[in-house]
């Protein structure tokens, strides 16, 4: 029977392993190759299990031995334990094999297959019930005397079989449990659970094994008493012999019945193809238990019918053999299509599940990243908000500091005391001056306190604490919503008239607020301010209600934040004050209230300005166009001003100093002049001209005036680039092109001076294209050649150019208009082209807009008018009396327009004319503005108009930002010349020249030279007399200033042309330098090193005449010489130098010369051969004074090697 049991267990393990290998084959994995190492692992585990089990059993047996105290009982127990141990070895091997099979399945099957296997396990458990019956039957056999009369061998076999069947049952249970664990898919905790189940099984096994052994002992005791060792060995040999015989018989019968069973099984397969996979799994799962049950039944039958035992065994063997063969065949054939399909579906589901999990994980990570990014963005915004808040608070404090309204605690207390005194005086009947004469400030000591009764104060206490505390809470939470809007300065004007009605408003508000009191938030302040807090909050409420009466509903987040901040500060300040000082708290709050009101007024004005600009931007009228601003640019002497003179019929160029434009000028060309100038153009539609005129700006062409060219081009809508047809593109022309490119300003080119072409015949009353056709062939050829050359030069600058009458695409190609400012040819075509381009291509830019846009061009001092500013009004309108803010050297200047002067039409703005005074001016115009405090105005920056007083600080701040950049350009030095010019533009040009010439400037001014300017310049006489100079450009010098300058020794250089001024100053510097060189000639000692030529000693004493080689430096007449190697002995002064019998002033390095050295007056003459030898080196005797003189006045005559020699000699002479 043991043999049968072994065969069954081997079959079941083989089935398991084969199925696992089959699943691995379907997936394409080589599971079969991995089975051998797995078996090895299983053996190791089996040995380990066996050792554990043996140790436990030995402990148990020792306990039984101590109880029984009989050697026979111990022998019996040992005899019964051995078969159990053998059975355990077999079960352990089965478990290992099953484990291998289940591992293979786990890799191939998914969760769905595991569920199916669990169902089959539950079915296979049912046949395990007969174990209990076997035990019962065993006990019956023990009691029955007939059965006891059987041979001892049979009894021993039956007991062994029973023990083996119990062991098989336990093993089958373990394998089922393991299969459940594996099929559950919990891979993470699989090994832990398996170990725990193993431990539990061992415990159960111990508990079960004890009673079976005892029952076996009882049976043995009832059948016989003692077995010798020889008997046991004989029984064992008999059992082994019988097993071998049975195996041989089995093999024979298997071969006989193989063919017959094949046919039967094939038929059954054909009948039931669908049931085969299930049966296969059932067989695989059920073989251990079913085999155990059948074995037990066979054992019972063997004990009952000993005669028929052999036949039954044969039948059982045949039956099991056939079953085994069938299973092997089925496995060889492989799984059915349905099984393969099920496995493939399971694999597909597994892959889908993995993909789904992967997608979910990616989505989760993406969500987390988005949340993190959102959090960071919120943190950044919060940080920015805090920084803005801090910056705003800082700016507000700075502004109040500048205005003198940021009071310290001591100042507030002093102010409070003064107000208390005033109140007492007023109560005594003394007349106190009204606050109308003082700066605007709301009177705190008047009606408000007198009108309020104690009942009203009590009723307001709850209301105000709630009203003020709630906004504080809102600030803490960072919620921007707030009902009250910031008050404005305008509210102050109507305050006195509204004070009477305010109490009613407050009473109404207090009634409404009492109803809502439950919903409001209240915050307690640490120190409880009593009446001061109420009074302060009353004022806050009145301010807000004043605003509500006015109907001002504008608001922004930033303003609300400031308002909340101010409320919070008010609370804090109220908490700090002492309760017994009513008057001091009132006045203290008054100053705080003024400050917060100003802040609110500032924000309100800012919003108003922005709103106005926005509205003006929307209300642009494209039908009505303003006059285009046209800028004239070009190189020196190309004829810019001459072209304008021809257009205006003026002679501005003749009146200019040296014919050079040194200021920016503006000319208004009216529509009538345009029509007059373009009458010779046939295809010009004069009736449909939409522009009201043109404003032409003339800029200087000289290199020094690049700042003015830049300023002029920044204003213009379209530019005229004047090019001399005889010279092409010149340096300032290219600079102008680059300026226009950077500003993205459209332009047309005037090819001027065509009258210089040989044989040119003028025809100013006809179109220039027609005039060109009338010219001789040689003139036309020359023109075409020069025009093509200029087109090529433009191409080199990256611009396409074409003659205007050949240009089909004005947007891509720059138009070239041939002109002659001298004869007037091409002037009409130039104006026609300007009009056409501006009203078609630039119509949106020229659309009429009410928003003011103006730029300060020049600052000029005029006799009888004071300092005036020339302004280009680009958009909007200016009125007399408007408050304007203009940039100044020391900050923005606020002043009122006292006069608006316009030159007559077709007249230059900068040229002194009979100006026409206007009350109102519309764009676009060149306007001269009269006003106070314009001396320090900076040109090149915008002019702004404040329509209300509260807008002034806002506009000032706007200008400050732009002002910083311009002011950085003008940096004064401690030592330098004093520069004075008529306009800021020319002053900038002069300063630029001084910078390039490395001439420092210590002071600047605009306007005529006065005594104060001479005083400032005379300061330099003490520091550095060479800089005690005034450079006056295009300004008048007062007579008393000139006299003072002569007496103090200050030089004033004056010129109307900037280059003449440069030349005069340069000449002065050179003369001054020569004068100083002559003065320091005897102090300055040039360094030299000479070697004596011993064969050329002409005279050894008084004077020493010797031939020398100049090794380093330079030898000059008057250089004192000494010999360092002979204790620095002074041998005399060089009085004469000769080369080839010719006298020279200087001998340079490398020359061989003859020098005459005369002794120093008053000293004994030195002698060659006694005081110094031919081997000694002669050097010039330098000192600190001589080195300084060289640095200051002889630097140009020194070379780098000379300075190196000075460094060397300084060490020799130990000069610091």
Swiss-Prot record:
Binds 1 monovalent cation per monomer in the active site. Structural cofactor that stabilizes the GTP-bound 'on' state. May also act as a transition state stabilizer of the hydrolysis reaction. It is found in: Cytoplasm. Keywords: Cytoplasm, GTP-binding, Hydrolase, Initiation factor, Metal-binding, Nucleotide-binding, Phosphoprotein, Protein biosynthesis. The modification Phosphoserine is found at residues 66, 108, 114, 137, 139, 165, 172, 183-184, 187, 191, 209, 215, 223, 437, 544, 553, 556, 584-585, 587, 591, 1164. Residues 19-32 have a biased composition (Low complexity). Residues 1-604 are annotated as: Disordered. It comes from the Eukaryota. Residues 659-663 are annotated as: G2. GO terms for biological process: regulation of translational initiation; ribosome assembly; translational initiation. Residues 634-641 are annotated as: G1. It is an enzyme of class 3 (hydrolase). Its EC number is 3.6.5.3. Residues 698-701 are annotated as: G3. Residues 752-755 are annotated as: G4. Residues 625-842 form the tr-type G domain. GO terms for cellular component: cytoplasm; synapse. Residues 820-822 are annotated as: G5. It catalyses: GTP + H2O = GDP + phosphate + H(+). Belongs to the TRAFAC class translation factor GTPase superfamily. Classic translation factor GTPase family. IF-2 subfamily. This is Eukaryotic translation initiation factor 5B. It comes from Rattus norvegicus (Rat). The gene is Eif5b.
